[in-house]
Amino acid sequence: MRIALRLGAIAAACLWAAACARPSISDVGDAKTGAALIGQAQCGACHAIPGIAAADGLSGPPLKGFAQRSIIAGMLANTPSNLVAWLRDPQKIVPGNAMPDTHLSDAQAQDVAAYLYTLR
């Protein structure tokens, strides 16, 4: 019983540490390209996004301070791999959510993620 409790505590600590780790922007993609893609995909129709012209949407969460968030999509640790997966196919991650299919390639999603990680 004690071993199970300790293992559970260790697992919880590892998940917490992973969620709190902040990725290096250079490890994700190109932030400048990501900003352009965000504009093209009209993400600002739903989200308020600092640094993106006319990105003042109110139906999605505002993305100011995105890099400081520990959780994305209400349930995922804020890691580059989780963010890229979410950007590529949000319905696969959380079926029925309001985020539309972005039609981003893996490389494009990495670039968008790089931009989002500049938002502190």
What kind of feature is each model-predicted range?
Residues 21-25, 46-53, 68, 88:
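Detector for the c-type heme attachment site
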Residues 31, 35-37, 50-84:
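Gly/Gly-Pro-rich "capping" loops immediately C-terminal to redox-active cysteine motifs
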Residues 45, 57-66, 86-116:
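Axial heme c-ligation environment in periplasmic c-type cytochrome domains
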Residues 20-39:
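Electrostatic cytochrome c docking/interface patches
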